[in-house]
């Protein structure tokens, strides 16, 4: 049996699939992986990305933060790829119960998926750090470099988890609950190097753990199937 045939059989035999995805899921949509060859971590910048994407940097240098954010992070022209669409199809068929993503791009929603846990937040929503008023992407794009609240003039922040910030406890708890209930877990496009997100996999005691990634994650996993190919190419060949 080929790896694809094995994957198809596992999906056919599962009724509670959870998908856990990282940056590699969106690279086929043209969004570079932070840690990949062409990623932000390998580009020459005045500050390193980890510093620029920290809460303290956002507060101290909102202009430089937003310059970096708008030019390097916002992926406005990206469209869902085959992986996003196939996952939405699997959810519609009642096979896939949840998507847990480390991405902030909103491409799973754009493809039609409903039950999504965004561990690192979303670039599609924003809030005033002073009064809490909520804003959408259009407000940010139509504002000058740094967006300020139209009510209280407070600094507006993206609803993404920056370095020095904790992940949302409720999102984490719900994601862990979904993984604990799963009979199949597909881990794709992530090196599982970021905690506490990577620790969520410890909650999985189901039958099939599948990894689709360029490299096998360093984390010790009881993997049933490992596929070293682009996520979209693999999932595109799956029949629902």
Predicted regions and their residues:
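Conserved catalytic core of sirtuin-type NAD+-dependent deacylases
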Residues: 1-240
